[in-house]
Amino acid sequence: MKRIICILLMLLFTFPAFAQENPFAPYEIAIPDGAVLENGEGSHTFVSGKTRVVAMLIPRVPDADIEAALQRMVFQFDPDAVMEDFLPMAEGYAAVTSRSDDQFGAGVDQLNVLILGPSGDLLILSGYDLDGNEDKVQSLLDALLENLTVNALPLVQTN
C-alpha cells in the first residue's frame, strides 16, 4: 500500500498537469452543494441557479493594521458601497461586509465580502442574483464563508 501511495505521489509531482492549482491560494474555498465553479479568463464565479458570486484574489503588500486597510479598500472596490460589519475571523485575518443598493432600481444589487490576511492577499467575494433575490445571494455567500480555510483551518469564527 505504501508503495502505491509513493508511486502516485511521484506521478503527481512528475506531471504537474495532473495537479490542480488553487486560484485562491493561500485561501481554500470549497464549492457548496448545488453550486459550480465557472472559470473565465482571469475570473472565477460560483454559480447556483441565478445567483453568482465572483471571487477575486489580489496579491498585495501586507498592512500593519488590516482592519483600517479593509475600511479603505471597501470604497476603493465600490465607491457606492455601504460598509456593514466586520466578521469574526481567525487571528491575523479580518473580513468586512458591504452592500450596494438599488443602483438599477431593482433593490439590492450586490453583497460583498472583503477578506484580508497577514500575507496581504485580498480575497473579494462579490455576489448578486439575476432576479434580485438578496436571500439567495446571502445563502451562497454564507456557504462559501462557512467552508473558507487557510491550511485547513477555518477562517470565519462561529460562536
Question: Which positions does each model-derived feature cover?
Answer:
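Sec-dependent N-terminal signal peptides
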Residues: 4-15
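Residues embedded in well-ordered secondary-structure elements
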Residues: 6, 24, 35, 102-103, ...
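Sec/Tat signal peptide C-region and signal peptidase I cleavage site
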Residues: 15-21
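N-terminal export/targeting and maturation segments
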Residues: 21-38, 43, 47, 52-53
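Surface-exposed amphipathic alpha-helical segments
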Residues: 26-35, 125-159
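Conserved polar/disulfide-associated segments of primarily extracytoplasmic proteins
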Residues: 40-133
